[in-house]
């Protein structure tokens, strides 16, 4: 039996524009995904007597029907009978469930990355499996800052050294179903495409500050506390911009310097003890390259 430990990072949507609807009914997006230092931790026992998923904290997640289980099922079906080992996964969930931070997608991507290597599944099939499991899973395979378009199947990695590092994640302690948000989303008109991506740091920062999350108003209608959180975040000293992530209910504020983020975190924890509040940092591509060099 072999053991593997993998950390799966949360994502935030620096913006999320809904630009249309595909014939199949899925919405078409344009978004920039960034990943932050908030992780689920997964322990994989390969070749165990047992198989299945165990969540180490109390959770509403179905042990028999979840993104990890679906990912494993799709991968097994792409292998010859008898060539795969039992897989038993223990999951320490730190990313809030149904929060707009793609915890389930990150966990599935961790399983896909590991098992596709162990079982010799090629890159093209790996990407197909990721998309079958969920629209956020393809970008989570790399867990690097990326422009994401279409139904989540178009992923373009971005140079991200210009991004401010410091982030505060804030949300009400409630779950908000992505499906319920999209079921209510019925705009008079979709957002226009941003067209050509910015070519320099200043233009990127300008776009990020002026952009939005098109799902915000629907999510606020379902969870009004999101509006209060966004108003509070936008008023914090040193905040570059704040926004809801994904379909909510988690929001974030971006700061240029750590001191401003620390002072804001203390203020929030003192005045809003009932909110989920987590100070973290954006993971830049250079961080991952440095880590990879350290593992050689």
Curated annotation (Swiss-Prot):
<dbReference type="InterPro" id="IPR036554">
    <property type="entry name" value="GHMP_kinase_C_sf"/>
</dbReference>
<feature type="active site">
    <location>
        <position position="136"/>
    </location>
</feature>
<keyword id="KW-0067">ATP-binding</keyword>
<keyword id="KW-0418">Kinase</keyword>
<keyword id="KW-0547">Nucleotide-binding</keyword>
<dbReference type="GO" id="GO:0019288">
    <property type="term" value="P:isopentenyl diphosphate biosynthetic process, methylerythritol 4-phosphate pathway"/>
</dbReference>
<dbReference type="InterPro" id="IPR020568">
    <property type="entry name" value="Ribosomal_Su5_D2-typ_SF"/>
</dbReference>
<dbReference type="InterPro" id="IPR013750">
    <property type="entry name" value="GHMP_kinase_C_dom"/>
</dbReference>
<protein>
    <recommendedName>
        <fullName>4-diphosphocytidyl-2-C-methyl-D-erythritol kinase</fullName>
        <ecNumber>2.7.1.148</ecNumber>
    </recommendedName>
</protein>
<dbReference type="GO" id="GO:0050515">
    <property type="term" value="F:4-(cytidine 5'-diphospho)-2-C-methyl-D-erythritol kinase activity"/>
</dbReference>
<feature type="binding site">
    <location>
        <begin position="96"/>
        <end position="106"/>
    </location>
    <ligand>
        <name>ATP</name>
    </ligand>
</feature>
<dbReference type="InterPro" id="IPR014721">
    <property type="entry name" value="Ribsml_uS5_D2-typ_fold_subgr"/>
</dbReference>
<comment type="function">
    <text>Catalyzes the phosphorylation of the position 2 hydroxy group of 4-diphosphocytidyl-2C-methyl-D-erythritol.</text>
</comment>
<comment type="similarity">
    <text>Belongs to the GHMP kinase family. IspE subfamily.</text>
</comment>
<dbReference type="Pfam" id="PF08544">
    <property type="entry name" value="GHMP_kinases_C"/>
</dbReference>
<feature type="active site">
    <location>
        <position position="11"/>
    </location>
</feature>
<dbReference type="InterPro" id="IPR004424">
    <property type="entry name" value="IspE"/>
</dbReference>
<dbReference type="GO" id="GO:0016114">
    <property type="term" value="P:terpenoid biosynthetic process"/>
</dbReference>
<dbReference type="GO" id="GO:0005524">
    <property type="term" value="F:ATP binding"/>
</dbReference>
<dbReference type="InterPro" id="IPR006204">
    <property type="entry name" value="GHMP_kinase_N_dom"/>
</dbReference>
<dbReference type="Pfam" id="PF00288">
    <property type="entry name" value="GHMP_kinases_N"/>
</dbReference>
<keyword id="KW-0808">Transferase</keyword>
<keyword id="KW-0414">Isoprene biosynthesis</keyword>
<comment type="pathway">
    <text>Isoprenoid biosynthesis; isopentenyl diphosphate biosynthesis via DXP pathway; isopentenyl diphosphate from 1-deoxy-D-xylulose 5-phosphate: step 3/6.</text>
</comment>
């Amino acid at each position: 039996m072999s053991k593997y430990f993998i950390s799966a990072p949360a994502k935030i949507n620096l913006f999320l524009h809904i630009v249309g609807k595909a014939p199949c009914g899925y919405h078409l997006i344009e978004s920039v995904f960034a990943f932050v230092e908030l992780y689920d931790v997964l322990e994989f026992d390969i070749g165990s007597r047992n198989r299945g998923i165990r969540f180490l904290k109390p959770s509403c997640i179905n042990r028999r029907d979840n993104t990890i289980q679906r990912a494993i099922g799709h991968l097994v079906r792409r292998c010859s009978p008898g060539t795969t080992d039992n897989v038993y996964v223990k999951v320490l969930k730190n990313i809030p469930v149904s929060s707009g931070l793609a915890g389930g997608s990150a966990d599935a991507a961790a399983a896909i990355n590991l098992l596709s290597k162990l079982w010799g599944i090629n890159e093209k099939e790996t990407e197909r499996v990721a998309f079958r499991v969920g629209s956020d899973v393809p970008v989570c395979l790399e867990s690097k800052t990326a422009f994401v378009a279409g139904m989540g199947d178009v992923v373009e990695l971005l140079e991200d050294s210009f991004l401010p590092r410091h982030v505060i994640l804030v949300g009400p302690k409630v779950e908000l179903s992505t499906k319920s948000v999209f079921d209510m989303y019925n705009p008079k008109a979709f957002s226009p495409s941003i067209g050509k991506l910015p070519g320099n740091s200043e233009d990127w920062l300008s776009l990020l500050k002026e952009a939005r999350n098109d799902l915000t108003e629907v999510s606020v209608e379902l969870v009004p506390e999101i509006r209060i959180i966004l108003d509070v975040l936008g008023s914090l000293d040193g905040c570059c911009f704040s926004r809801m992530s994904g379909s909510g209910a988690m929001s974030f504020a971006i700061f240029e310097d750590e001191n401003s983020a620390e002072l804001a975190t203390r203020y929030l924890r003192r005045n809003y003890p009932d909110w989920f509040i987590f100070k973290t940092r954006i993971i830049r591509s250079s961080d991952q390259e440095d880590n990879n060099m350290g593992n050689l």
